[in-house]
UniProtKB/Swiss-Prot annotation:
Provenance organism: Rickettsia peacockii (strain Rustic)
EC number assigned by the record: 2.7.4.6
GO CC, one annotated term: cytoplasm
UniProt cross-references to InterPro entries, sorted A to Z: NDK-like_dom, NDK-like_dom_sf, Nucleoside_diP_kinase, Nucleoside_diP_kinase_AS
Keywords: ATP-binding, Cytoplasm, Kinase, Magnesium, Metal-binding, Nucleotide metabolism, Nucleotide-binding, Phosphoprotein, Transferase
Cell compartment(s), UniProt: Cytoplasm
Predominant subcellular localization, coarse grouping: cytoplasm
Cofactor(s) the protein needs: Mg(2+)
Assembly and binders: Homotetramer.
UniProt protein name: Nucleoside diphosphate kinase
Taxonomic lineage from the root: Bacteria, Pseudomonadati, Pseudomonadota, Alphaproteobacteria, Rickettsiales
Annotated catalytic residues: H117
Length: 140
């Protein structure tokens, strides 16, 4: 097993429903350590740059609108195989298809408003962490 860092974003739907603590409990109970965390409102420009890989997809504009509709909580998580572990704890993108006991099944409302985003690979994790955090903000 390898110690990894991964990126997580608690989305506006979960923030509006006061679920930050609940999401963090899922993450920590799974063995992930939150080593950086901050809340912010993303600008449309930041959101478009962050989700640039989806720019040509039909849902891109609605994704940018949604993710800028309220505050988000940005996080760096650390743990053994953190990327895979975080993906497992999050559950399937569509809450209706996610397994019971996952964040998206228990807290998600729809495919878009599914409460959480997480990196899907090492390259994505590195890019997404660097997009929002500098090294001095990450506590070991």
């Amino acid at each position: 097993m390898t110690i990894q860092y991964t990126f997580s974003m608690i989305k506006p739907d979960a923030i509006k429903r006061n679920k930050i603590g609940q999401v963090n409990t899922y993450l920590e109970n799974a063995g992930l350590k939150i080593v950086a965390q901050k809340m912010k409102f993303l600008t449309k420009y930041e959101a478009a740059c962050f989700y640039d890989e989806h720019r040509a997809r039909p849902f891109f504009n609605s994704l940018v609108e949604y993710i800028t509709s309220g505050a988000v909580v940005l996080q760096v998580l650390k743990g053994e195989d953190a990327i895979t572990l975080n993906r497992t704890v999050m559950g399937a993108t569509n809450p209706a298809e996610a397994e019971a006991g996952t964040i998206r099944k228990d807290l998600g409302e729809s495919i878009e408003a599914n409460s959480i985003h997480g990196s899907d690979s090492e390259n994505s994790a590195k890019r997404e962490i660097a997009f929002f955090f500098n090294k001095s903000e990450i506590i070991e």
